[in-house]
Amino acid sequence: MEARDKQVLRSLRLELGAEVLVEGLVLQYLYQEGILTENHIQEINAQTTGLRKTMLLLDILPSRGPKAFDTFLDSLQEFPWVREKLKKAREEAMTDLPAGDRLTGIPSHILNSSPSDRQINQLAQRLGPEWEPMVLSLGLSQTDIYRCKANHPHNVQSQVVEAFIRWRQRFGKQATFQSLHNGLRAVEVDPSLLLHMLE
């Protein structure tokens, strides 16, 4: 589950608990869709009050994969007002910076802008061999990587710079710091690396 969605569940925790969501078909639907296991259902049903059952469900959901939040929304057929509240909170969270971006401390207007040649150069200096899977995650191909290597056979940094410039040319306005941030996370590199590009 995305950090933003976890935050939404956390912020509405008490309100959701008061609705006692576990009394209807919610658990069965989540089980049917593979979000909850049989053990989870037993554990939740073993709780003595509806509030505790709902709280335990809210504790379990964040660790149940990327589809957990959307499937939870789908499960709330009997609670349309709760579903609307969650959707609204999620939309508001989307207009704020997602939690993962707050960590980097980068304002949203910069996250939505494209890096300059100088900034790409700074990123290239700091990236190791993970630059290849990163540019693949950004949408370049193995052929692009091969060409960058062929054009600069003896200079890895120049290969990296050319790869990111190709990415920026190809994706235009979509080639943003936000995309770089997501790319760094995809290859498990600390996204705070972007802060050095902005110094």
From Swiss-Prot:
Primary localization: cytoplasm
Keywords per UniProt: Apoptosis, Cytoplasm, Disease variant, Intellectual disability, Lissencephaly, Nucleus
Location of the CARD domain: 1-91
Cell location: Cytoplasm; Nucleus
SUPFAM superfamilies: DEATH domain (SSF47986)
BP GO terms, sorted: apoptotic signaling pathway; cellular response to mechanical stimulus; DNA damage response; DNA damage response, signal transduction by p53 class mediator; extrinsic apoptotic signaling pathway via death domain receptors; positive regulation of apoptotic process; positive regulation of apoptotic signaling pathway
Gene Ontology cellular-component annotations: cytoplasm; cytosol; endopeptidase complex; nucleolus; nucleus
Resulting phenotype, residue 146 to A: Loss of interaction with PIDD1. Decreased PIDDosome assembly. Decreased CASP2 activation
Tissues expressing the protein: Constitutively expressed in most tissues, with particularly high expression in adult heart, testis, liver, skeletal muscle, fetal liver and kidney.
Mutagenesis / variant outcome for changing residue 188 to K: No effect on interaction with PIDD1
Consequence when changing residue 149 to E: Loss of interaction with PIDD1
GO molecular function: death domain binding; protease binding; protein-macromolecule adaptor activity
Domain Death stretches: 116-188
Assembly and binders: Forms a complex named the PIDDosome with PIDD1 and CASP2. Interacts (via Death domain) with RIPK1 (via Death domain); the interaction is direct. Interacts with TRADD. Interacts with TNFRSF1A.
Clinical disorder: Intellectual developmental disorder, autosomal recessive 34, with variant lissencephaly: A disorder characterized by mild to moderate intellectual disability, megalencephaly or enlarged head circumference, and a mild variant of lissencephaly with anterior-predominant pachygyria with shallow and unusually wide sulci and mildly thickened cortex. Some patients may have seizures.
Entry note about domains: The Death domain mediates the interaction with PIDD1 and the formation of a complex composed of 5 PIDD1 and 7 CRADD proteins which in turn probably recruit 7 CASP2 to form the PIDDosome. The Death domain mediates a direct interaction with the Death domain of RIPK1. The CARD domain mediates a direct interaction with CASP2.
Function: Adapter protein that associates with PIDD1 and the caspase CASP2 to form the PIDDosome, a complex that activates CASP2 and triggers apoptosis. Also recruits CASP2 to the TNFR-1 signaling complex through its interaction with RIPK1 and TRADD and may play a role in the tumor necrosis factor-mediated signaling pathway.
Family matches, as PANTHER family: DEATH DOMAIN-CONTAINING PROTEIN CRADD (PTHR15034:SF5)
Protein name in UniProt: Death domain-containing protein CRADD
Organism in which the protein naturally occurs: Homo sapiens
Lineage: Eukaryota, Metazoa, Chordata, Craniata, Vertebrata
Gene name of this polypeptide: CRADD
